[in-house]
Amino acid sequence: MADLNAIADQIQGLTLLEASQLVKMLEEKLGVSAAAAVAAPAAGGGAAAAAPAAEEKTEFTVVLTGAGANKINVIKAVREVTSLGLKEAKDLVDGAPKPIKEGVSKEEAATIAKKFTDAGATVEVK
C-alpha cells in the first residue's frame, strides 16, 4: 500500500483548482458524488451537536412568582441578592412575577431559590 503520509503531503501542496480537479477525477473513477458524502455528515453532525447543547443548560434565571405572607422578609432577601435599594426591592416584590437574577449558575440559582423559599416567597428557576 502506498505511503499515506506522502499522499497527504502531496494533496496538501495542491492549489484550489488542482484540488477541485482531483475531486472530479475521483468522483468519475469511483462512481461517487463528493457533494452527497460531504452534506450528509455535516447535517448529522450539526443535529448531534445541537442536542447536547439543549440538554446542558448553564445559565438560569430565578423568577419571583409570589411574595407570600412575609413580604418584609422577601424584600430583605431581594436586597441581599440583588443589592437593590429599598424602594426598588419593594417594587420588584409588588410586581411579581419578575426575574430576580438572570444568567446565574445552577448552584447559585438553587441557593437563591432556597433563600427566597425560606423567606416565605415562591420562586421558579428557569
UniProtKB/Swiss-Prot annotation:
Pfam families: Ribosomal_L12, Ribosomal_L12_N. CDD domains: Ribosomal_L7_L12. NCBIfam families: L12 (TIGR00855). SUPFAM superfamilies: ClpS-like (SSF54736), Ribosomal protein L7/12, oligomerisation (N-terminal) domain (SSF48300). HAMAP family: Ribosomal_bL12 (MF_00368). This is Large ribosomal subunit protein bL12. The lineage of its organism: Bacteria, Pseudomonadati, Acidobacteriota, Terriglobia, Bryobacterales. GO terms for cellular component: cytoplasm; ribonucleoprotein complex; ribosome.
